[in-house]
């Protein structure tokens, strides 16, 4: 394979999902595989970091082999290797970083540390219909809730963020209160479909304050108190919680668009798969003339495809790690990233 074809391998191991993606400079995404260790963690009611790390060790090499074989490429065809360096669980990040650095060193190709949330932010660029820069991005996941003004790849300004629980974390904790198990977000969404919108009305924290920051911990507390009083109204509580969170996110997105003057909104991260949220945002977009872009459902949650894409942009721009030492950044501000030339 001619080296004019730039091929990037992406490795995602920031939490409980092991993902591998392969991105080609001419063909785009040519392969990806994902393994989730949700079943391992479900009996504990949440992610156990040590178990997640051990599972990454078992899964990542077979996934790489499968992706390369299915795409009819070999390790020797790779031009660079990108890996999630943060934010995330330290042990889990170390697995991906160590493997990526070792492979890159042995193959004589560059490696690149990728910011997990930049991967999510750029995931809609894997679709046929792609957003154009500049835009506002709403990143909603189990660990983060952020509004970002995106002028170009690597040129990011945080407009607002959660001051306590991320919205995905609030979904999971509320689901646990309702006895729905882990992961709770999808289960709560399913239960909410059976709920009555008019039974309960949850508060909308911080929507009447200036600024674009979020707070979701109060909703979780409100859900617990409501459930204590009305234990037979699980579906109605789930519905009220979902309505409140989608309203908060919609209101803040609209304010961010008005503040920046942007006409494009990108919504990504695990919670972006929520259909009620998409419906609410799409309705807002039609009303104010804003174009909204999402990743396909399989790329809303953590995956290797988005890491391969984000890594490809930077590696093909000449950016790479300066050495093969294993470095991770469990806490990493997205504003620290450099702009692509």
Swiss-Prot record:
InterPro entries from the UniProt entry: ATPase_NBD (IPR043129), Gcp-like_dom (IPR000905), KAE1/TsaD (IPR017861), Peptidase_M22_CS (IPR017860), TsaD (IPR022450)
GO MF annotation terms: iron ion binding; N(6)-L-threonylcarbamoyladenine synthase activity
Keyword Iron: yes
Main subcellular localisation: cytoplasm
GO biological processes: tRNA threonylcarbamoyladenosine modification
A single Gene Ontology CC term: cytoplasm
Co-factor requirement: Fe(2+)
Reaction catalysed by this enzyme: L-threonylcarbamoyladenylate + adenosine(37) in tRNA = N(6)-L-threonylcarbamoyladenosine(37) in tRNA + AMP + H(+)
EC number(s) from the headed UniProt entry: 2.3.1.234
Subcellular location field: Cytoplasm
One Pfam family linked to the record: TsaD
Sorted UniProt keywords: Acyltransferase, Cytoplasm, Iron, Metal-binding, Transferase, tRNA processing
Cofactor binding notes: Binds 1 Fe(2+) ion per subunit.
Family, per entry: Belongs to the KAE1 / TsaD family.
NCBIfam families noted in UniProt: gcp_kae1, T6A_TsaD_YgjD
Task performed by this protein: Required for the formation of a threonylcarbamoyl group on adenosine at position 37 (t(6)A37) in tRNAs that read codons beginning with adenine. Is involved in the transfer of the threonylcarbamoyl moiety of threonylcarbamoyl-AMP (TC-AMP) to the N6 group of A37, together with TsaE and TsaB. TsaD likely plays a direct catalytic role in this reaction.
Protein name in UniProt: tRNA N6-adenosine threonylcarbamoyltransferase
């Amino acid at each position: 394979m001619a080296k004019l074809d730039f091929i990037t391998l992406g490795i995602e191991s920031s939490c409980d999902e092991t993902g591998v993606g392969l991105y080609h400079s001419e063909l785009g995404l040519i392969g990806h595989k994902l393994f989730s260790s949700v079943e391992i963690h479900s009996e504990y009611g949440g992610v156990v970091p040590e178990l997640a790390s051990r599972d990454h060790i078992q899964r990542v090499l077979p996934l790489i082999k499968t992706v390369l074989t299915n795409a009819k490429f070999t390790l020797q065809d790779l031009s660079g290797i990108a890996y999630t360096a943060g934010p995330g669980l330290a042990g889990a990040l170390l697995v991906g970083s160590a493997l990526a650095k070792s492979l890159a060193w042995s193959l004589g190709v560059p490696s690149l540390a990728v910011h997990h949330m930049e991967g999510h932010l750029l995931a809609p660029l894997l679709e046929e219909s792609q957003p154009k820069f500049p835009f506002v991005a709403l990143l909603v996941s189990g660990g983060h809730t952020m509004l970002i003004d995106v002028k170009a790849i690597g040129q990011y300004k945080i407009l607002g963020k959660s001051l306590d629980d991320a919205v995905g974390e609030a979904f999971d904790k509320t689901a646990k209160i309702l006895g729905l198990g882990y992961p709770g977000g999808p289960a709560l969404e399913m239960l909410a479909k059976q709920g009555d919108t008019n039974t309960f009305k949850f508060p909308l924290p911080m929507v009447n304050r200036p600024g674009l920051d979020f707070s979701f911990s109060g909703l979780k507390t409100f859900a617990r108190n409501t459930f204590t009083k009305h234990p037979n109204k699980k579906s109605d509580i789930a519905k009220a919680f979902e309505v409140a969170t989608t309203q908060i996110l919609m209101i803040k997105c609209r304010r961010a668009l008005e503040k920046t003057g942007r006409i494009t909104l990108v919504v990504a991260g695990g919670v972006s798969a929520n259909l009620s949220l998409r419906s609410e945002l799409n309705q807002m977009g039609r009303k104010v003339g804003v174009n909204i872009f999402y990743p396909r459902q399989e790329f809303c949650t953590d995956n290797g495809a988005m890491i391969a894409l984000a890594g490809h942009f930077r590696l093909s721009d000449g950016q790479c790690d300066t050495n093969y030492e294993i470095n991770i950044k469990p806490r990493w501000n997205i504003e620290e990233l450099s702009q692509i030339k």
